[in-house]
């Protein structure tokens, strides 16, 4: 390949901007490189939540939505918003997939097992979507419904499941069609890193009704776990009431709308070459319905199929004959590839990908640096190779350690990132390269909630930084949003953004003084 002075787009996952220093792990951390850049390099703040990223107003941003908007350069109506609208305008209750499944189950006198994250978080799911499904079952007078609920505590306060259960019980009083048959923390049910030892007990509970503990109702179970210092996210797979496992002829409906943490559990039912663990039983399902498409290789019946996107940043770079590298550790690999390409599985011409394995630890506060040092080494080697025109990389630390709620560990994570950024810039400088730094959403800048008096483990709605290092250019606007990143990056490369990109170019070349 030719010698290229690379342009690196560095996405610091979960690195938001907050004027308030209190509970702010980024402000508390010792970050000499970041501080120097913030004082001397052009930078602005970008909106990364709510309407500017296709979410409902005031809804916090998240990694999937953030990466899609950075890559697309336009506002994309998110699945969350799309499903909310379908509920409000009546299309949800008319969805042909839901009707077909319920009609078939009524005919065969089989059961519907609805599973998913019971949460008002709006990141992977929303409990209102479950409530809309219950209303539909009630409308169709279908009452053989079993609920298998995953608990959040990550995009919500660590102990908030009882609030959601209260809302669910109110809905069940109105629409008495279902029973709660199991609960389980998302740590087990929604793993995305091939930690099959977490998923196996969930599968055994769903298919055989097996769990270490059994409780008469979900509230009793949760009180027991809280007493034993186990918060929502980490509640082990637990049978509730009478055993109603998934049987031949039954249907499963997974109501999560976000794909990355739904794929593994789905694959235990649908992947013909599954090797994660030995399945004692494999029910022959009449349907496996997913709210959205989780993976084109997982043949679910999809209630809300994907809307294709053309001319995302990766496609534009490829069509201009430029080489690009996507690099991240396991936790965020899907984000810089699948989501960055607009939810598209295909790899563009001259697009290469490197995944650095994430460390195998129970929670990332135990290893705040995660795989950042290995990622940095690999990234520097790629810069020095001069094989790539553009490198898009993600550092997961601020988000993944921020999610643990451990303030000191998150400070360590930020300090590790600062060292990594300094090393990456040295390599870029030596190769005549340029650096754009941003984030997909906030997290580490707000680590405690005075409102709930609990650790703030969720994302925030704060803006994120957009910083340019490399000289010769300046920002023309005082603020923007994530959709402005792709057009601005193309401007640095001298490429006119395609008409599909409605984001603005925020960077302009400095005029030479006469």
UniProtKB/Swiss-Prot annotation:
Q: Which cofactor does it need?
A: Mn(2+)
Which InterPro entries does the annotation name?
Alkaline_phosphatase_core_sf (IPR017850), BPG-indep_PGM_N (IPR011258), Metalloenzyme (IPR006124), PGAM_B_sf (IPR036646), Pgm_bpd_ind (IPR005995)
Molecular function in Gene Ontology = manganese ion binding; phosphoglycerate mutase activity
Keyword Cytoplasm attached: no
Signal sequence extent: none
Question: What top-level class of enzyme does the UniProt entry assign?
Answer: isomerase
Tell me the route in metabolism or biology where this protein functions. Carbohydrate degradation; glycolysis; pyruvate from D-glyceraldehyde 3-phosphate: step 3/5
- What name does UniProt use for this protein? 2,3-bisphosphoglycerate-independent phosphoglycerate mutase
Residues given in the record as Mn(2+) 1 binding sites: 399, 403, 459
Which GO annotations describe the biological process of this protein?
A: glucose catabolic process; glycolytic process
Catalysed reactions listed for this entry: (2R)-2-phosphoglycerate = (2R)-3-phosphoglycerate
Identify the gene encoding this protein.
Answer: gpmI
Q: How is the cofactor bound?
A: Binds 2 manganese ions per subunit.
The role this protein plays is: Catalyzes the interconversion of 2-phosphoglycerate and 3-phosphoglycerate.
**Which Pfam families does this UniProt record tie to the protein?**
iPGM_N, Metalloenzyme
Q: What organism does this protein naturally occur in?
A: Legionella pneumophila subsp. pneumophila (strain Philadelphia 1 / ATCC 33152 / DSM 7513)
Q: Transmembrane stretches, by residue range?
A: none
């Amino acid at each position: 390949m030719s010698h290229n002075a690379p342009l690196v787009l560095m996405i610091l996952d979960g690195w938001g901007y907050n004027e308030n220093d209190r509970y702010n792990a980024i402000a508390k951390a010792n970050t000499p490189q970041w501080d120097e850049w913030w004082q001397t390099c052009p930078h602005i703040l970008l909106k990364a939540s709510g309407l500017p990223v296709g979410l409902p107003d005031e809804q916090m941003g998240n990694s999937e939505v953030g990466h899609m908007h950075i890559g697309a350069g336009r506002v994309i109506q998110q699945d969350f918003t799309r499903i909310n609208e379908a509920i409000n305008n009546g299309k949800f209750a008319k969805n042909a997939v839901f009707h077909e499944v319920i009609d078939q189950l009524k005919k065969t006198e089989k059961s519907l097992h609805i599973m998913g994250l019971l949460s008002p978080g709006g990141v992977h799911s929303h409990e209102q979507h479950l409530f809309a499904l219950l209303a539909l079952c009630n409308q169709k007078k279908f009452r053989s419904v079993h609920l298998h609920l995953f608990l959040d505590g990550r995009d919500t306060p660590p102990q908030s499941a009882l609030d959601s259960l209260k809302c669910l019980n109110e809905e069940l009083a109105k629409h008495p069609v279902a029973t709660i048959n199991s609960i389980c923390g998302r740590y087990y049910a929604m793993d995305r890193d091939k930690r099959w030892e977490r998923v196996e007990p969930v599968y055994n509970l769903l298919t055989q009704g097996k769990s270490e503990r059994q409780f008469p109702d979900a509230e009793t179970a949760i009180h027991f776990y809280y007493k034993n210092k186990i918060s929502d996210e980490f509640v082990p797979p637990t049978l509730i009431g009478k055993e109603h496992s998934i049987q031949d002829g039954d249907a499963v409906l997974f109501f999560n709308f976000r794909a990355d943490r739904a794929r593994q559990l789905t694959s235990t039912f649908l992947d013909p070459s599954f090797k994660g663990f030995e399945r004692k039983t494999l029910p022959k399902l009449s349907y496996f319905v997913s709210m959205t498409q989780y993976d084109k290789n997982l043949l679910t019946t999809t209630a809300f199929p994907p809307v294709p996107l053309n001319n995302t940043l990766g496609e534009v770079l490829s069509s201009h004959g430029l080489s690009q590298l996507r690099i991240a550790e396991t936790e965020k690999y899907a984000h810089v590839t699948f989501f960055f390409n607009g939810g598209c599985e295909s790899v563009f011409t001259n697009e290469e990908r490197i995944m650095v394995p994430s460390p195998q630890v129970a929670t990332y506060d135990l290893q705040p640096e995660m795989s950042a040092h290995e990622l940095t080494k690999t990234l520097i080697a790629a810069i020095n190779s001069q094989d790539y025109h553009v490198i898009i990389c993600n550092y997961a630390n601020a988000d993944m350690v921020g999610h643990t709620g451990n303030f000191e560990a998150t400070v360590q994570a930020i300090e590790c990132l600062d060292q990594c950024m300094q090393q990456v810039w040295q390599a870029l400088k030596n190769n005549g390269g340029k650096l754009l730094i941003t984030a997909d959403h906030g997290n580490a800048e707000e680590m405690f909630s005075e409102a709930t008096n609990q650790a703030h483990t969720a994302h925030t709605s704060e803006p994120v930084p957009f910083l340019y290092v490399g000289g010769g250019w300046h920002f023309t606007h005082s603020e923007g949003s994530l959709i402005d990143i792709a057009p601005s990056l193309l401007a640095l490369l001298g490429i006119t953004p395609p008409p599909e990109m409605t984001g603005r170019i925020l960077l302009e070349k400095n005029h030479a003084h006469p």
